């Protein structure tokens, strides 16, 4: 009986440890398809991203990312995958939007943020 309880305890410890380790080594979020110049320059993608920004993001970031509750964005310093990861996974006080917006919608937000229409 003692051997059985020890085995169960060891098994549970290993399972819990594996779950913790999996959370610590979470893979970075990637868009379902690579960002292309054409995608980022598409008027329909920029327009859709602008609508999402106006509906959701501006409440913290402001109309064009400044002034708002959140820090000022500097889109000319960002790469598309970096912005996508921030929108998808969140960062510090910014919530993750992975369960709210589709992959395509999050990609459209990126297109808008990196567009000339967005830049403050």
What are these language model-derived features?
Residues 31-38, 63-66, 77, 103, ...:
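Mature soluble domains of exported/periplasmic/lumenal proteins and thiol-rich metal-chelating peptides
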Residues 23-26, 87, 99-120:
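C-terminal capping alpha-helices of c-type cytochrome domains
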Residues 39-50, 62-93:
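Gly/Gly-Pro-rich "capping" loops immediately C-terminal to redox-active cysteine motifs
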Residues 60, 96-97:
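Thr-Gly-centered strand-to-loop micro-motif
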Residues 24-52, 120:
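Electrostatic cytochrome c docking/interface patches
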Residues 1-5:
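Positively charged n-region of N-terminal signal peptides that target proteins for export
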Residues 49, 53-63, 109-113:
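The canonical Cys-X-X-Cys-His
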Residues 9-17:
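Bacterial N-terminal signal peptides
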């Amino acid at each position: 009986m003692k051997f059985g309880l020890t085995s169960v305890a060891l098994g549970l410890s290993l399972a819990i440890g594996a779950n913790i380790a999996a959370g610590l080594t979470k893979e970075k979020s990637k868009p379902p398809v690579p960002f292309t110049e054409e995608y980022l320059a598409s008027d329909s993608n920029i327009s859709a991203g602008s609508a999402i920004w106006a509906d959701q993001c501006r409440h913290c970031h402001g109309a064009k990312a400044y002034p708002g509750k959140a820090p000022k964005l500097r889109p000319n310093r960002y790469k598309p995958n970096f912005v996508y990861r921030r929108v998808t996974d969140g960062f510090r006080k910014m919530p993750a939007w992975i369960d709210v917006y589709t992959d395509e919608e999050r990609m459209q937000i990126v297109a808008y943020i990196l567009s000339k229409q967005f830049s403050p």
